[in-house]
Amino acid sequence: MPKRTDIQKIMVIGSGPIIIGQAAEFDYAGTQACLSLKEEGYEVVLVNSNPATIMTDKEIADKVYIEPITLEFVTRILRKERPDALLPTLGGQTGLNMAMELSKNGILDELGVELLGTRLSAIDQAEDRDLFKQLMEELEQPIPESEIVNTVEEAIAFAATIGYPVIVRPAFTLGGTGGGMCANEKELREITENGLKLSPVTQCLIERSIAGFKEIEYEVMRDSADNALVVCNMENFDPVGIHTGDSIVFAPAQTMSDYENQMLRDASLSIIRALKIEGGCNVQLALDPNSFKYYVIEVNPRVSRSSALASKATGYPIAKLAAKIAVGLTLDEVINPVTGSTYAMFEPALDYVVAKIPRFPFDKFEKGERRLGTQMKATGEVMAIGRNIEESLLKACRSLEIGVHHNEIPELAAVSDDTLIEKVVKAQDDRLFYVSEAIRRGYTPEEIAELTKIDIFYLDKLLHIFEIEQELGAHPQDLEVLKIAKLNGFSDRKIAELWGTTDDQVRQLRLENKIVPVYKMVDTCAAEFDSETPYFYSTYGWENESIRSDKESVLVLGSGPIRIGQGVEFDYATVHSVKAIQAAGYEAIIMNSNPETVSTDFSVSDKLYFEPLTFEDVMNVIDLEQPKGVIVQFGGQTAINLAEPLAKAGVTILGTQVADLDRAEDRDLFEQALKELDIPQPPGQTATNEEEAALAARKIGFPVLVRPSYVLGGRAMEIVENEEDLRSYMRTAVKASPDHPVLVDSYIVGQECEVDAISDGKNVLIPGIMEHIERAGVHSGDSMAVYPPQTLSQKVQETIADYTKRLAIGLHCLGMMNIQFVIKDEKVYVIEVNPRASRTVPFLSKVTNIPMAQVATKLILGQSLSELGYQNGLYPESTRVHIKAPVFSFTKLAKVDSLLGPEMKSTGEVMGSDATLEKALYKAFEASYLHLPTFGNVVFTIADDAKEEALNLARRFQNIGYGILATEGTAAFFASHGLQAQPVGKIGDDDKDIPSFVRKGRIQAIINTVGTKRTADEDGEQIRRSAIEHGVPLFTALDTANAMLKVLESRSFVTEAI
């Protein structure tokens, strides 16, 4: 059936900020879909609150609204734009929930807007636990016995009838939020109570636990003519019981018989047909390893994390095709863009194995609860492709960037057997490494399979890897063993370790004996048809399929898996850099390992290498492609860290040179440069041990800011107020980088701001200055940033511009750089300089309309700013106010403290823009889900050093009609200044403490600051946790609370007695 002509204008809802459970895969899907709809001639209107994505670029849709995804704003845009149809299935859970809300409020009917892709009834049937159960019963598909409950008592009664363990799943929440496995009544009570609060419809499903079954997923597509196909099936290495987003996954499934595959395939296709979904859908099933029994676990009636993985694993572009199906095209009329010759009706066939491993944030959150369960915790993932399981698994391990280059963490060799087995049984994020260690200690695959329910097939592969390690150890320099190791994915570094030599010598030996990888094409059809996609992976085998072209090429290194501190912003810069390379007439080659992102979409670059970002893997590509040079400044710290080894190997680094990168990163060289350029910085010193640090701090005076050099996202960075805390920091945190000393700086409490600049070596363009709302001490990635600055004097802005120019020229910067300043008493100090693209590039590019990464790339390739039409200096500022606000994922991470400090904790960002600061702030708060009603109660629990300031805020809250509550000390201080606050009890004062007030819904906001001593704050942590769990707005910085007050004041009328 040809595409529909009765609709012209389509609105697409994006997925909003990146949070755990809903990451960059939706940026990829949404970008694909919008372009796909435009290609068919429709007018596309996009709404998304996330500035960090390619999806919210002007070129992606005809009209792009970066506005909050809330009923209020989406309705406004619908009324203004009057689209004919709405496509909600590409915006993750956010998009689906928004569509439901619009429909339930009658907005879609009122405006005559039709839903495309998935019918509302299908969303309901898949998401509402009760309807889903009914549908499965009608289709005679087995599901675990379960009951819908609306109260804790009902849950306990049902569990008594089926027996523990049971699983709790709240309705309409994302990534398993609020759910969990319960082994007894106490756990059930706790998890259900929390789950009911988090479910927008206060219902939970209590179901029999089928933990230990194999978890299999099918990615299916269907069109309006009822054609349906399986794009790909995937098997979790971890059995049921661990969220699929936190599981290691292989595609295609490895351990099912043909009969089992057909059985689950039929089930998946019958489900998508029953739901009448037009587009993509993901079905998760549990298969009993000992019989042919299976259960349907859940269905996602939309494009999901797994579909991004399936798209990259097979090359079959699910989101692109889902958009075409939504407007009436059928699978047998759409050409598969990968082959360019076959139709989309052909099911992909794979002649390789794909491994996906999640990337967790526990390197940043050492206190976080690492046990894995039904609630997702990973921030990102890596994917690797190989010709066997060993190869793809080991390539994925070294893609993770957690300091491992093999399936082993050397420290685990020291762990006792008891601890080892406990970690093998109770899965944490690093279980693979514990299981591998158990095999090295001689536990048999049978024993481990019994303990973990991991299929013995995979454990045999781990055993095979260990056997190769032993062979290597026994036969140093043996070429035959070397070949076997390389066929199974071993890195040069691991081989060197086992041979007692260097990676470099192993590489030389390989090159001399022509043991080099070949590159194979990902073509969706196992090479049955000719394919035109330039999408490759390495393997050691015959016949290289990646042919070097005659055109000069430039290689861009991506930023690897998404983690806190290095998010989708860097992918954004990578994609823009590629556009500029192509515009300059070169062939653009991308190398990256992240399946969720736009940069690894084969249609973005001229060639894509899906490979780990390690020196060995990058050099192999360079040896084959012989590019003009490599661009490292858009791939975050991942790419910057490769600059030095690549340069040493004779590779041309384009842009700022390695010596100059070092001058910005190395403390002593940087100080030297600032002295020469006559630019002030807070006094500081370097220390390599505890005594030196204590000495330095005494000399500078407390408070001091301590941090290791060469890290991204403020890892292991702290503000320390006294010697005792400093010594404990030196003992626990310095392991962050032993070769690099620790920096001890005077901590200046002032106004913080940052600048991104672009330099051609002679002139410097400064697109804008961003002022932080939170004063210095909160990591820049966790601060709200305002552009243009609202409180900086003209003189300060001129000084900032002047210092920026001096630094860019003085450090021989070519391309992008980011500088952070702190201002105190009108004096400007430089805190740090990053000679690369930073996480503010997408935001600033959007609000100034300067495509910064593209401009920087053109300069790197030899053009000048004046040739591109830009002036030297500060760019004229926008007349509107724009705010970038952070978004956190604390609900997913138990035991992680939500207190903001110099270590970054946010996973994503939103943007609010309007004519005034207050309006822009309102939008930013709404978009980041910080919604405050116009009246209610606010509770203050404030450290002594901030009580003065808090008093002023409390008075203003009172003036607009808020009730003020406070903890004992704060209440006494307020009272002595004539403000009566209702006192709340200490933690543990049964019904009178803050957590119990929060549970009863009597508190609308919490303002909690922490004093100089970090140690005595367990009460504060409980208070903050209760706010997070119940979705009560929490402010740990008074500046943020002040910004929220500005919004509330601007929205309320002042009532004064005469």
UniProtKB/Swiss-Prot annotation:
InterPro entries: ATP-grasp (IPR011761), ATP_grasp_subdomain_1 (IPR013815), CarbamoylP_synth_lsu (IPR006275), CarbamoylP_synth_lsu_oligo (IPR005480), CarbamoylP_synth_lsu_oligo_sf (IPR036897), CbamoylP_synth_lsu-like_ATP-bd (IPR005479), CbamoylP_synth_lsu_CPSase_dom (IPR005483), MGS-like_dom (IPR011607). Residues 930-1058 form the MGS-like domain. Mg(2+) 1 binds at Q284, E298. Residues 547-929 are annotated as: Carbamoyl phosphate synthetic domain. Signal peptide: none annotated. Keywords: Amino-acid biosynthesis, Arginine biosynthesis, ATP-binding, Ligase, Magnesium, Manganese, Metal-binding, Nucleotide-binding, Pyrimidine biosynthesis, Repeat. It catalyses: hydrogencarbonate + L-glutamine + 2 ATP + H2O = carbamoyl phosphate + L-glutamate + 2 ADP + phosphate + 2 H(+). Residues 1-401 are annotated as: Carboxyphosphate synthetic domain. Mn(2+) 4 binds at E832, N834. Its EC number is 6.3.4.16, 6.3.5.5. ATP 2 binds at R707, S746, I748, E752, G777, V778, H779, S780, Q820, E832. Mg(2+) 2 binds at E298, N300. Mg(2+) 4 binds at E832, N834. Mn(2+) 2 binds at E298, N300. Pathway: Amino-acid biosynthesis; L-arginine biosynthesis; carbamoyl phosphate from bicarbonate: step 1/1; Pyrimidine metabolism; UMP biosynthesis via de novo pathway; (S)-dihydroorotate from bicarbonate: step 1/3. Mn(2+) 1 binds at Q284, E298. Binds 4 Mg(2+) or Mn(2+) ions per subunit. GO terms for cellular component: cytoplasm. The large subunit is composed of 2 ATP-grasp domains that are involved in binding the 2 ATP molecules needed for carbamoyl phosphate synthesis. The N-terminal ATP-grasp domain (referred to as the carboxyphosphate synthetic component) catalyzes the ATP-dependent phosphorylation of hydrogencarbonate to carboxyphosphate and the subsequent nucleophilic attack by ammonia to form a carbamate intermediate. Belongs to the CarB family. Composed of two chains; the small (or glutamine) chain promotes the hydrolysis of glutamine to ammonia, which is used by the large (or ammonia) chain to synthesize carbamoyl phosphate. Tetramer of heterodimers (alpha,beta)4. This is Carbamoyl phosphate synthase large chain. It comes from Streptococcus pneumoniae serotype 19F (strain G54).
